[in-house]
């Protein structure tokens, strides 16, 4: 089966890489999406941000751990895992066409046309993460696919468990796009979050939600934040 590079066609920008970490592939029938944890310069068009092989290894391991954890705990909230090739570091997922953001023409205005109750579904997924003690910072709309009207969450390379040691923003900056960084730093200043010092995962989750205010309706962001605020483990 033939696989091609998978891009998002962003208005005003054209074809853009689907994420900053791995190389995204999709078959011509658009039924299989592949996360290839390989630093492909052609795909990333020379804008590779995760160039350290050790860091790529860590992202691959984190994806494996938390995606498979979700497969056990909430299989209805992720795409079906068709295959995991540990040698080539590829994860093959069953999908029904392009990702949620792409189907919405890369605009929040198209979300309801693609999935009328997208907000409720996304909040359910976030609630499940909170219930499981997870903090997932890859929240871009392209981190979801749609299957029979149901959202499916992907990109667990940027997910942490409450049981792990704290991290600092500087440790994960390579995962954050330059556009996102422009929103991140003012939010950090407003929230009193350090760039250098390890921070509580709860605070980093709140920071993450704030950095996505331009990608989602404001009321959605507030509801997402409230999930972690009211979670019993906080």
Predicted regions and their residues:
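Conserved hydrophobic "DFG−1" position in protein kinase catalytic cores
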Residues: 24, 93-95, 145-146
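Protein kinase-like catalytic core scaffold
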Residues: 32, 77, 91, 152-153
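Short C-lobe core helix of eukaryotic-like protein kinase catalytic domains
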Residues: 122-130
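Catalytic-loop of the protein kinase fold
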Residues: 129-146
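C-lobe/activation-segment region of protein kinase-like
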Residues: 147-234
